[in-house]
Regions:
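Generic beta-sheet signal
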Residues: 129-135
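Phosphate-coordination/substrate-recognition cap region in phosphate-metabolizing enzymes
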Residues: 24-90
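Acidic, low-complexity terminal tails and accessory targeting/binding regions
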Residues: 59, 70-81, 123, 127-129, ...
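Short glycine/proline- and acidic residue-enriched helix-loop micro-motifs
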Residues: 88-109
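Amphipathic, non-transmembrane alpha-helical scaffold segments
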Residues: 16, 20, 43, 107, ...
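An N-terminal RHG(E/S)-centered segment typical of histidine phosphatases
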Residues: 1-36, 51, 55-59, 78, ...
Length: 194
């Protein structure tokens, strides 16, 4: 989101000061880890998150288009309050498995794209290799749901915070999670009942 708009794949959406601080905190947290590679969505905000981690490890960020945000089609750049008034909003919240964004992709297509990308990365690196993928919260939720066998209609029950860490172990065609939505500091925007 940008302010109160659905950012999606909009170009020129950069991290704000808080986001840059979070990216620096991630780089510091990862500084002692033997990272072999770092991959990112091509969008500016993910590259700006990935670059401090890459610099810390003397690596180059490798751009993977399959890590891109969901293609929200005509919804991209639209005011969220206006979208919430649309007849499709409730449908998206309750039956996302059956929804395709107008002029965009479906959640099922986005999930398949992300799962295939992560599976491919798991196949080209050794079992104990550590790689970092920087992506988008909905795409991370979709991939967590995929690898845990959570029905697509329930993926929105998962919460992924900005600059959180999800650790996925892929080996011999099997997936296990070491962490989901691990935050380095408690998100300020969380209040009881959120």
């Amino acid at each position: 989101m940008v302010g109160k708009k659905l950012a999606g794949r909009l170009p020129d959406v950069h991290l704000n000061e808080a986001g840059r601080t979070q990216a620096g905190n991630l780089a510091a947290a990862f500084s002692g880890l033997p990272i072999k590679a770092i991959f990112s969505s091509p969008l500016e905000r993910t590259l700006e998150t990935a670059q401090p981690i890459a610099r810390e490890h003397d690596l180059t960020v490798e751009i993977l288009p399959d890590l891109l945000e969901i293609d929200f089609g005509n919804w991209q750049g639209q005011d969220l309050e206006e979208l919430k008034k649309s007849s499709d909003w409730k449908y998206v919240q309750e039956q996302p498995a059956d929804f395709r964004f107008p002029m965009g992709e479906s959640f099922a297509e986005a999930q398949q794209r992300m799962a295939a990308c992560l599976t491919h990365i798991g196949e080209i690196y050794q079992k104990d290799d550590l790689v970092v993928c920087v992506g988008h919260s909905d795409m991370i939720r979709l991939s967590v749901a995929h690898f845990l066998g959570i029905p697509l209609n329930d993926f929105q029950r998962l919460r992924i915070e900005t600059a959180s860490v999800t650790v996925l172990y892929l080996s011999d065609g099997k997936a296990n999670f070491g962490a989901i939505n691990h935050v380095l500091s408690f998100p300020e925007n969380l209040k009881p009942g959120d």
